[in-house]
């Protein structure tokens, strides 16, 4: 029996991957987390798609030309990238490395396809699936966004059930009903707190 010990917990920074179907509220949840000034580093995804009027360069996405995106691929400077609905999206490696080296937890928002790609490369990341309470609510959210063409809306609604089938590949699920963003934020912060109490920390290597 141990009667005397000296235990100093050494916390390792986490790489958190937040994903889920289009319209589930990923942007809204992370925006609320940013409002609270939580000690996290948020990685901005790079994309070739056109910027929406409501979006800000360097905040919502880094918007670049297709030729620039191809250059990042050739330099192996993207953690993952994919062609989604005809546009390229990618997660830059450099800011992740920099944040982890400072000891900061890192949050990356990607679609379900991107999360699967990252899991093959960094299996020790923490994978969180943001879930709608039901398909009816997800449909209403997508329709109310007013940013989707009818064809894009049909594609996203057809893809959502297939994405939800990937739920078992994730570590945690957070249900995000309309109007309950604060609860979703609390659950994500509880996940982060629990992960920092692991006996065997997750070691992230990029």
Swiss-Prot record:
The keyword Kinase appears for this protein: yes
Originating gene: gmk
Superkingdom of the source species: Bacteria
Protein's name in the database: Guanylate kinase
Chain's role: Essential for recycling GMP and indirectly, cGMP.
Reaction(s) catalysed (UniProt annotation): GMP + ATP = GDP + ADP
Enzyme class, spelled out: transferase
GO cellular component: cytosol
Family: Belongs to the guanylate kinase family.
SUPFAM superfamilies tied to this protein: P-loop containing nucleoside triphosphate hydrolases
Gene3D superfamilies attached to this UniProt entry: Guanylate Kinase phosphate binding domain, P-loop containing nucleotide triphosphate hydrolases
């Amino acid at each position: 029996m141990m009667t005397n010990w000296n235990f100093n917990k050494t916390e390792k920074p986490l790489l958190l991957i937040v994903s889920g179907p289009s319209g589930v509220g990923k942007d809204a949840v992370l925006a609320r987390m940013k409002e609270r000034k939580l000690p996290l580093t948020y990685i901005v995804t790079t994309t070739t798609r056109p910027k929406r009027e409501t979006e800000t360069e360097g905040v919502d996405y880094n918007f670049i030309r297709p030729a620039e995106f191809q250059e990042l691929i050739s330099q192996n400077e993207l953690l993952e990238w994919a062609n989604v609905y005809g546009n390229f999206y990618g997660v830059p490696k450099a800011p992740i490395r920099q944040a982890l080296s400072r000891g900061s937890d890192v949050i990356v928002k990607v679609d379900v396809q991107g999360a699967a790609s990252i899991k093959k490369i960094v299996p020790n990341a923490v994978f969180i699936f943001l879930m709608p309470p039901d398909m009816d609510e997800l449909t209403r959210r997508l329709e109310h966004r007013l940013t989707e063409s009818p064809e894009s809306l049909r594609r996203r609604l057809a893809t959502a059930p297939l994405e939800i089938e990937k739920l078992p590949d994730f570590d945690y699920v957070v249900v995000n009903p309309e109007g309950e963003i604060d609860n979703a934020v609390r659950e994500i912060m509880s996940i982060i707190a629990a992960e920092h109490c692991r006996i065997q920390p997750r070691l992230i290597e990029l």
